[in-house]
Amino acid sequence: MVVEADKKALICSFCSKKQHEVKKLIAGPAVFICDECIDLCTDIMKEENKVALKQITSSIPTPQKICGILNDYVVGQDQAKKILAVAVYNHYKRLEYVQSGNNDVELNKSNILLIGPTGSGKTLLAQTLAKILDVPFTMADATSLTEAGYVGEDVENILLRLLIASEFNIAKAQKGIIYIDEVDKIARKSENPSITRDVSGEGVQQALLKIMEGTVASVPPQGGRKHPQQDFVQLDTSNILFICGGAFMGIDSIITSRTNHSSIGFAANVNIDKEKNNSEILKSLEIEDLTKFGLIPEFIGRLPIVTTLDELDKEALITILTKPKNAIVKQYQKQFELDDAELVIDYSALETIAEKALAKKTGARGLRSILEHLLLDSMYKVAELKKQRVTITKEVVNGLVEPIMTSLISTKSNKKQPIITDIPA
């Protein structure tokens, strides 16, 4: 057997330096990289991180400006808006401080927990914040998550969605916002430790702890379970802001039980208001109530900022229908305009729509489905007829009559009518 004496010299695949010209030469599948190129790549990544952070932090509005923009889209919830505005502002100022290299005071991350009834604006608040700050944003449903190794979705898939939202720009993804909805559904099934594994409750809380606190997570770019041989993307979650939301149905009973128990005997308040609504009860929320509900103390500790949202009343729902920039009625009016038609809604009809949404206990979320049902036939017809004015009255909402359609051509005045009529003074 003849051994080749003059073997080909190993060189860096990037800078072409030979092995003896560098300190280290690291081998990969058919490629090599030297220590100098690794240092250069590290410097480039650090510089890109600084640029990405500077773009975000240089454009951070003040808390008052954030609140002002939120007011354009979200009706009511003033206290929640204020808390969120301050929390988000401080979060991104913290990133700027950390990136500057200062370490005289260690600033910890403050994730947020939103508690409020269905349709009160939790998701919309998170979405609007991401839009204001122009950062990558993704939403996840906690009910689909399970502990690793069980049927369901791994928590790392949440990070994958954020990467996709940032177009796999790791530096941008590491400064993004993740909203986890229905977090109350991963509450522990029982206060007492169970001998059976709670893979969709406490198990998910445990799995979320690390990524919420801050860790370098291995994210599978093609999803975790179908492609086990893929290369992982390393994502640092230390600067990702986590916002969790949930309705926490039944926590009002826990709060009431605690407050009533603490007011027995001579210290009892005889003027206890038995007519308190859920919003007022939630204002008395304590950490122990969340623990009693089923969140483990470690998980609650990762969510230091807790705010509650009010239940929307009829007036708030009417405002949601008509006032915000993305108001539902405005959206439908624009749809009709695209077909050379007009949509006019009586104020009494809006009141009835709001009452129906309240009866269904779906909050603002139910408004669109009610309007969609009311306007379906009209939208079907105006696309063909054109130049039509569609009027929705209280009787139409109650199903007593069909929407009133009149031709704009035949009317004496072609002048555009206001979107809402008979508004009370």
From Swiss-Prot:
Question: What are the GO cellular component annotations?
Answer: HslUV protease complex
Residue ranges of every copy of the ClpX-type ZB domain listed in the record: 1-53
- By its UniProt entry, which PROSITE patterns does this protein fall under? CLPX_ZB
Query: Which residues take part in binding ATP?
Result: 117-124
This protein's record includes keyword Cell cycle: no
| Binding-site residues for Zn(2+), renumbered to this chain | 12, 15, 34, 37
Q: State the UniProt keywords alphabetically.
A: ATP-binding, Chaperone, Metal-binding, Nucleotide-binding, Zinc
**Example GO BP:** cell division
Annotated SMART domains: AAA (SM00382), ClpB_D2-small (SM01086), zf-C4_ClpX (SM00994)
One MF term from GO for this chain?
protein dimerization activity
In terms of InterPro entries, this protein maps to:
AAA+_ATPase (IPR003593), ATP-dep_Clp_protease_ClpX (IPR050052), ATPase_AAA_core (IPR003959), Clp_ATPase_C (IPR019489), Clp_protease_ATP-bd_su_ClpX (IPR004487), ClpX_bact (IPR046425), P-loop_NTPase (IPR027417), Znf_CppX_C4 (IPR010603)
Q: Which Pfam families match?
A: AAA_2 (PF07724), ClpB_D2-small (PF10431), zf-C4_ClpX (PF06689)
What does the UniProt record say this protein does?
ATP-dependent specificity component of the Clp protease. It directs the protease to specific substrates. Can perform chaperone functions in the absence of ClpP.
The record's section on NCBIfam families has: clpX (TIGR00382), PRK05342.1 (NF003745)
Assembly, in brief, is: Component of the ClpX-ClpP complex. Forms a hexameric ring that, in the presence of ATP, binds to fourteen ClpP subunits assembled into a disk-like structure with a central cavity, resembling the structure of eukaryotic proteasomes.
As for family, the record states: Belongs to the ClpX chaperone family.
Q: What is this protein called?
A: ATP-dependent Clp protease ATP-binding subunit ClpX
Q: From which source organism is this entry?
A: Rickettsia conorii (strain ATCC VR-613 / Malish 7)
Q: What is the lineage of its organism?
A: Bacteria, Pseudomonadati, Pseudomonadota, Alphaproteobacteria, Rickettsiales
